[in-house]
Amino acid sequence: MAKSNKRRPAPEKPVKTRKCVFCSKKGQTIDYKDTALLRTYISERGKIRARRVTGNCVQHQRDIAVAVKNAREVALLPFGSSTR
């Protein structure tokens, strides 16, 4: 005998769209030497935060990822957390 599917649909949450910070502020650039800016896009475990979390556009998220990777190579940012 087949089960009836009586689940309620999930309530719709309002989608909060975030604007890209770098698109709204045209003069702000992404540089690997600006560690204060790059640390806002890195989690406490050392991972780069996702685009849906940061609210950046595709191009600026890629630029942030490249800048973080360059800063890690020059030892300005840590590669990851040493605690497990």
UniProtKB/Swiss-Prot annotation:
Domain of life, per lineage: Bacteria
GO biological process, any: translation
Subunit description: Part of the 30S ribosomal subunit. Forms a tight heterodimer with protein bS6.
PANTHER family: 30S RIBOSOMAL PROTEIN S18, SMALL RIBOSOMAL SUBUNIT PROTEIN BS18A
Transmembrane segments: none
Source lineage: Bacteria, Bacillati, Actinomycetota, Actinomycetes, Mycobacteriales
Name by which UniProt lists this protein: Small ribosomal subunit protein bS18B
Role according to the record: Binds as a heterodimer with protein bS6 to the central domain of the 16S rRNA, where it helps stabilize the platform of the 30S subunit.
Name of the encoding gene: rpsR2
Record's keyword terms, sorted: Ribonucleoprotein, Ribosomal protein, RNA-binding, rRNA-binding
Disulphide connectivity of cysteines: none
